[in-house]
Amino acid sequence: MIKRLLEAVIRRTKNDTFRFDDSVPLSAIFELLVTKLMSLLRGFRVSFFIGSFSKIYLGKSVKIQHTKNIVFGDNVIVGDYAMLSALGKGPLSIGNNVNVGAFSRVIISTSYNDIGEFITIGDNVGFGEFAYLGGAGGLSIGKNSIIGQYFSAHPENHIFTNSKSLIR
């Protein structure tokens, strides 16, 4: 009964054709349920703080900085130990049904003297573990994209007209 109830919830919120494999034990389903509920509770805390009513699932030890500059879509999953930092001129905008893999970093800028531009992530995007997205020069990831593990993007605002000027 629990298995069918959880299937119905997953179908309604994430995947309308979802069905647990018959060989999945009930203990694994309970573990999934507890993990997702804990992630949702952590997400509610962030949603309340930023005044958003999106479903946000946060894994263990997720770090979020500059929350007032983040726009969350619905059904956003941020994996364990990931980091979101929205120090930028524009927002860190995360679309609907986005999954940020564990240990990933989505950081507009690390510089406080010349802050970065923005990061926009479209709907239905998935990131593998340990991905790094920087937004110093502005970064847009289109909808329905899949980004593999260890992917790294670092757009910058380099001055190419002066070859003697360092780019760091």
Give residue ranges: language-model regions.
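Proline-centered turn/helix-capping motifs that create local helix->coil transitions or kinks
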Residues: 153-162
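Surface-exposed acidic, glycine/proline-enriched linker/cap segments
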Residues: 164-168
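Domain-scale signature associated with acetyltransferase and cell-envelope carbohydrate enzymes
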Residues: 1-154
